[in-house]
Amino acid sequence: MYHAIVRRKLRRAFADINAGRYDGIVAQFAPQHRHAMPGRHALAGERRSVESTARWYARLQRLLPGLAFDVRAIVVGGMPWRTTAAVAWDDRFTLPDGTPGSNTGVHEFELRWGRVHSLVIHCDSQRLQHYCDRLVERGVAEAGAEPITDVR
């Protein structure tokens, strides 16, 4: 039963992003957590505070407006005090210049008592870098910005 509740909460979180409701996403993170995305692009890096994670989601929304996920699978294991979950997805979006884009990946979660303590987002980072480069060419300077990170 617990795993079904976690799957439902994760589906709801992705539905919120699909609907452009990002504010509730950050509220699900523990005050101290790990939010990371590998790569060398404006959405890469690692964050450990709610403030920096909120800035990251704001940047995501600006760079990839209309981002929508198609969740393919959700796998959940563990107990409430240490739950792991993986969400496999395909996404689609339209760049600010009107170009359609897409990617595929996995969100890897560690939850404790319903709060996100770790989220690592794995996707085709070269593909994402290509989209960021395209945005920079079209004058979107933020797409070429340094990653938002508070880890030194």
Predicted feature locations:
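A solvent-exposed, acidic/Ser-Thr-rich amphipathic alpha-helical stretch
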Residues: 23, 28-83
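Short, low-complexity N-terminal intrinsically disordered segments enriched in polar/charged residues
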Residues: 1-31, 138-152
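Short beta-strand segments enriched in hydrophobic/aromatic residues
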Residues: 29-30, 89-93, 123
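A short hydrophobic beta-strand element
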Residues: 81-91
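Short beta-strand edge/turn micro-motifs at domain boundaries
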Residues: 104-133
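Hydrophobic pocket/interface hotspot
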Residues: 13, 25-26, 33, 49, ...
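Short, cysteine-centered beta-strand-loop-beta hairpins and adjacent loop/turn segments enriched
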Residues: 63-66, 92-102
